[in-house]
Amino acid sequence: MGNDKEKYSKLRNIIPEMRRVKHIYFVGIGGAGMGGIAEVLVNEGYRLSGSDIAENAVTQRLASLGAKIHLGHKEEQVHGADVVVVSTAIHADNPELLEAQALRIPVVRRAEMLAELMRYRHGVAVAGTHGKTTTTSLIASVYGQAERDPTFVIGGLLNSAGTNARLGNSRYLIAEADESDASFLHLQPMVSVITNIEADHMDTYEGDFERLKSTFIDFLHNLPFYGIAVMCIDDPVVRELLPSVGRKIVTYGFSEDADVQALNFVQDGYRSRFTLRRTGVEDVEVMVNLPGEHNVLNALAAIAVASEDEIEDEAIIQALADFEGIGRRFEQLGCFDTDRGEVVLVDDYGHHPSEVAATIKAAKLGWPEKRLVMIYQPHRYSRTRDLYEDFVEVLSQVDCLLLLDVYSAGEAAIPGADSRALCRSIRLRGQLDPIFVADQEQLLTLLPDVLQEGDLLLTQGAGNIGALARQLAQNRLGFESTNNDSNRG
């Protein structure tokens, strides 16, 4: 066992040629995906440096581990690097990228570096429009509980580990597979998970949904012939693709024909309970420490992967029950005793209509007595335009809605695809009178007039609203009450 640990703990032991590489430079190092890979590499002993436009929790953690972080992009900062890793957010005219190319330093995308980490390991890659981060986190937690000591790279903070990446001492590598730029085609895992497929990031696929579906099939065919495709049969598009996949398939879902099926779903506040049914195995009662049917599906994916790897049910059930959650995935930031009574604050990353709908459904199912107040920040003008009517439909389902300006993510504004337009369209439906908040700083003075006793306040979106949610928590939602509050999560 000791030899295995030595073999798999260092990339240079798996690929001897990697010993030529001493210094790795990351352009756009502050992103969760980039930072996760960087953390694994710095823990492997590589000299690591990188740049981003601003400091954040990811860059601070990497600096604490010994990485050199530069704020801003300057061409001289790549000097001396043996390889440069670039984020998908980096434009072709970036000075560091241009300098690396001029100096003939190898330049690779994030997914290519992840593929090298995965090359000779037992890779588990989780793909899909929604649920990747939670599913990857659940799989990593199950493997950790089973003492498989995995390496993992996750797009969100795994609360139990205090990080989104970890270098393990075994042959297992569990990671998210990003379809947003089709770079997941670089990966060659042993197990691939498909959670669902919807129209998102369609600019990558030139607006062609058939091309998107075909790319997912290509991703599955990167599996070796002895690999396993774990697929959510509840998703109609995934179900449609099943006959086109020439690999062993294990399906999961609530559907009766699923190989790994959930029955008797009950949500008890933040927790979900269900009966697990698998072919040829006795039914088992399972509790997962996450709310909502969508999270039961994520748990089923983890169960399917672990069961195929012969992990004992005891470890699976314990890991799901003890799961401590992920940052910004229905994360409870506090329960505040205000001068108007108790208000619960929850923060969630979902930014696609289906994700927002799943979050709203879980909130209403777990806390049916509470009024649901949502602060929503749309993410990207293009997504708002492409899914406009879906956003109008789903955002109309809350009891009170505050809309922030669109978080552009570098995009130019698109007329008619902004928050003011959404407000007007939602108001015209006659169900809700949303409040447009032009300046985020207004929230601390606005919320005390909006919130009522017993409210569930949900901050929702993928932009900078997560930081805003924490600011609201620190400032007690704008209430000046001196009553004690309790943080529950």
UniProtKB/Swiss-Prot annotation:
Keywords: ATP-binding, Cell cycle, Cell division, Cell shape, Cell wall biogenesis/degradation, Cytoplasm, Ligase, Nucleotide-binding, Peptidoglycan synthesis. This is UDP-N-acetylmuramate--L-alanine ligase. GO terms for biological process: cell division; cell wall organization; peptidoglycan biosynthetic process; regulation of cell shape. Gene3D superfamilies: Mur ligase, C-terminal domain, Mur-like, catalytic domain, NAD(P)-binding Rossmann-like Domain. It catalyses: UDP-N-acetyl-alpha-D-muramate + L-alanine + ATP = UDP-N-acetyl-alpha-D-muramoyl-L-alanine + ADP + phosphate + H(+). Cell wall formation. It is an enzyme of class 6 (ligase). It comes from the Bacteria. ATP binds at residues 128-134. Coiled coil: none annotated. GO terms for cellular component: cytoplasm.
